[in-house]
């Protein structure tokens, strides 16, 4: 199947490569000419055969809005735009309505898998019409992990990114729990082998998980995380999750506390936040702050604007 990919960064570039390995014809566009197949969005659209599919993997907010606006002028009725970034579900509904006026389909797709997705596959959470999603299934089948799991058509437009938003909120809570446990073990003189304790939990315990595997990997590199500052950024989706909880009158004490702990880390050098920072670097390649300054181990480019769309701020 032929597909255009807009945005060839850490996620988009690997997704394009996985699609190529799966036998798809991928035409990629990026502002960096060194990695782009074409010089403009216009050329990308011209290279694709109708009916076209264009997957957008750029930061949410203004970059996505600008890209969708441009594609709306370039694409034809019957084409489909997929937003695979971390957009707000309210923006999805707006984009879908705008494109529908031109007969262009829209599917939102929350993507999880980080920098490991090229080999392991990406978990996909989609929102859109049944017809549009079914048409895209050859692409989804290639991107997702092997087996029956790893993909869901969560509902209408916006449902995919809403599900991904909640996924990321849960991730905040899990990371915070590991971080607090690590800080307690490090502070105690009872347990002598903290790293070994975490490593032993990877097999047979109820908390075994990929996040735990990544934490042990980080501790292998820096056993006491002495080289890291206790400072953790947030991509914005944790904030959106808490805001959605307020809108729906649903208590989220754990996720809210985890988000606030990240805010506090920017005021005080928090030992627990060293774990959160290390985990973010492990699964997403996000930048970390060392005791010597920036490590240069990755650019922290938030996947979402931290300010919700106007339609949500006003209600």
Regions found by a protein language model. Give the residues of each.
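ATP-dependent carboxylate/acyl-activation modules
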Residues: 1-10, 15-18, 142-145, 281, ...
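Rossmann-fold dinucleotide-binding core
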Residues: 67, 88-179, 183-185, 311
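Helical "substrate-binding/catalytic lid" subdomain
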Residues: 125, 135, 158-286
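Conserved dinucleotide-binding and phosphotransfer motif residues
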Residues: 22, 102, 248
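Rossmann-like NAD(P)-binding element
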Residues: 31-94, 100, 118-128
């Amino acid at each position: 199947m032929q597909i255009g990919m807009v945005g060839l960064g850490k996620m988009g570039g690997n997704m394009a490569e996985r699609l190529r390995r799966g036998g798809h014809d991928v035409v990629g566009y990026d502002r960096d000419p060194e990695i782009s197949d074409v010089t403009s969005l216009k050329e990308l659209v011209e290279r694709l055969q109708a009916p076209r599919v264009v997957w957008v993997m750029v930061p949410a907010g203004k970059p996505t809005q600008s890209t969708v606006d441009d594609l709306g002028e370039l694409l034809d009725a019957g084409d489909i735009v997929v937003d695979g970034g971390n957009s707000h579900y309210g923006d999805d509904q707006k984009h879908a309505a705008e494109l529908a006026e031109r007969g262009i389909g829209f599917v939102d797709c929350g993507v999880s898998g980080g920098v490991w997705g090229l080999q392991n596959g990406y978990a996909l959470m989609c929102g859109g019409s049944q017809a549009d999603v079914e048409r895209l299934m050859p692409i989804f089948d290639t991107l997702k992990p092997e087996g029956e799991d790893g993909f869901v058509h969560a509902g209408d437009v916006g449902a995919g990114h809403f599900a991904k938003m909640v996924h990321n909120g849960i991730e905040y809570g899990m990371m915070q729990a590991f971080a607090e446990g690590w800080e307690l073990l490090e502070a105690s003189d009872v347990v002598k082998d903290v790293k070994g304790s975490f490593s032993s939990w990877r097999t047979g315990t109820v908390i075994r998980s990929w996040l735990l595997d990544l934490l042990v990997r980080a501790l292998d590199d820096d056993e006491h995380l002495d080289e890291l500052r206790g400072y953790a950024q947030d991509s914005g989706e944790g904030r959106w999750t808490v805001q959605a909880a307020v809108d729906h009158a649903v208590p989220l004490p754990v996720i809210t506390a985890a988000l606030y702990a990240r805010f506090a880390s920017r005021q005080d050098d928090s030992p627990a936040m060293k774990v959160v920072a290390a985990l973010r670097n492990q699964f997403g390649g996000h930048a970390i702050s060392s005791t010597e300054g920036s490590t240069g181990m990755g650019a922290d480019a938030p996947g979402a604007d931290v300010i919700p769309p106007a339609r949500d701020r006003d209600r």
